[in-house]
């Protein structure tokens, strides 16, 4: 029974974490309870005892730096050696883990996997590790998403074709001008001329504002029919067309003025206020961040000055005038 107790105590001793600064070269551990240790410095009188923790060894480093500054080189060498040892241990454990992963794993015999309609294996009931199961699940989800996207594309295509099939028959001499404010139907002239570029009785019709310069560049040159002598049988139709174009131009100008006034009122009411509020918030955040940085820099400079004064108590600043 005593042998078992001694063995368990030795195992606990081995499991205790001992930092490199307390390995016996600079400090000697006298007593350790958990993480708390009582040590003696190897370069101080033997009656001096220091207490600390193995998880926070900053006070031990500061003692060497303040009382035994000649040992800083040795402390640096010990630190480098401890880091190299830790690196070698990590690389060794990594190699062991890789060799364990490469070892063959016994897999039970699996039944024939059922194939879906598209030829992708979906039903896989094999005794595989959890990593393969997650990979299989990812493949399933990607396949399902791809299938849903294909179904949505085909549905959109069918809807568009059905809409095209259900469109009413529009005569060739009828044009539809679509605006953001109102829908205006205009009778076009025979011969392919556009109503947006035709002027009657010295009143030009404005082109569509939303179509852009590229649309205007693609249009043919404007034809002034007021200077062309009318053909027999077309005088009545041209007169009715001129009156309809006058009505269209008046309605178009009225709708344009209304939309411009509405947009200007909306711009004056809302966006300027939003922009100003956003600018105020941004400036407040910037000023707060600058203030915090100034305070941090001020405290750092005060700390540096106090540290220098502590390390050099007899220093007196004598400026050369």
Swiss-Prot record:
Tissue: Germ cells specific. Expressed in all germ cells. During the first instar larvae, it is expressed in all germ cells of both sexes. In third instar larvae, it decreases in male germ cells while it remains in female germ cells. In adult ovary, it is expressed in cells of the germarium, including the stem cells. In the early previtellogenic stages, it is highly expressed in the nurse cells. During vitellogenesis, it is not translocated into the maturing egg. In testes, it is only expressed during some steps of male germline differentiation.
GO cellular component: chromatin; nucleus
Region (Disordered): 146-166, 227-248
Superkingdom assignment: Eukaryota
One of the protein's GO biological processes: female sex determination
Keyword Lyase: no
Keywords annotated in UniProt: Activator, Coiled coil, Nucleus, Transcription, Transcription regulation
Basic and acidic residues bias locations: 146-162
Subcellular localization: Nucleus
Any one GO molecular function term: chromatin binding
Regions of compositional bias (Low complexity) in chain numbering: 235-244
Sections of the chain in a coiled coil: 74-103, 147-167, 272-292
Role: Essential in the female germline for proper survival, sex determination and differentiation. Participates in the transcriptional activation of Otu. Does not regulate the expression of Ovo.
Name of the protein in its database record: Protein stand still
Organism: Drosophila melanogaster (Fruit fly)
Gene: stil
